[in-house]
Amino acid sequence: MSSLLDKTRMLNRILQKSGTEPVDFEDICDLLSDVLACNVYIISRKGKILGSKFYSGFECEEVREVVLKENRFPDFYNNKLLNVNETLSNSPNHDKCVFDNLKDCSINNKLSTIVPINGNRERLGTLLLARFDKEFTDEDLILAEYSATIIGLEILRSKQDQIEEEARKKAVVQLAIGTLSYSELEAVEHIFNELDGTEGLLVASKIADKVGITRSVIVNALRKFESAGVIESRSLGMKGTHIRILNDKLLEELKKIK
């Protein structure tokens, strides 16, 4: 039987293996499921399942259907989890389905342990463990809470990466817009008003006639955006030019100019 120290070292190896890359939540679920002999779910604050692992022989069809098909827990159940502010261990289901109290659970003596995932003074999600017949020990709970701390740090890092990526995309769009002349900017506004969503067909001559500018102004504006990686364009000959927006901040930044 592995000691608590051995199990903790296994978790540390996942961190060391990842280096600068994000930790794979599935790896944490696999390890916890193996060493704790239980089902493991990592759930975001909004109920999305970030990682999960069913322990061999401990499969609940109701939960499996939710995990595999929906990839999220029902809102009412997720709200119950969020109301747990500190580790709740060995909570019995009283032989009732956790998703429907009117239905009997197909497996008797199910015990759940709920570990809040917190970081930066906010609730980030929940680590949910489920086992049958055998209670979680203090050692199990120490490992679960340590895992929740690791997961919390990874969620925070992921959120920070997302914020930085959003800022980078905005900066790229702003730089691309800054290279346009007044007439090119006017052309760009009309071009993207003509598009249906994030991609569509553009006939430069029609827009040139409509706005009262030369076709070359439109072509130059599109080239500048394409070289900045903001859009992708493909000539279809007489039919026109197919344009696809690659940077989802483009339309948002153009609206600000208006």
UniProtKB/Swiss-Prot annotation:
The entry's keywords: Cytoplasm, DNA-binding, Repressor, Transcription, Transcription regulation
SUPFAM superfamilies assigned: GAF domain-like (SSF55781), Winged helix' DNA-binding domain (SSF46785)
Span list, region GAF domain: 1-156
Coiled-coil spans in chain: none
Main location group: cytoplasm
Similarity comment: Belongs to the CodY family.
Name of the protein: Global transcriptional regulator CodY
Organism: Clostridium botulinum (strain Langeland / NCTC 10281 / Type F)
Taxonomic lineage of the native organism: Bacteria, Bacillati, Bacillota, Clostridia, Eubacteriales
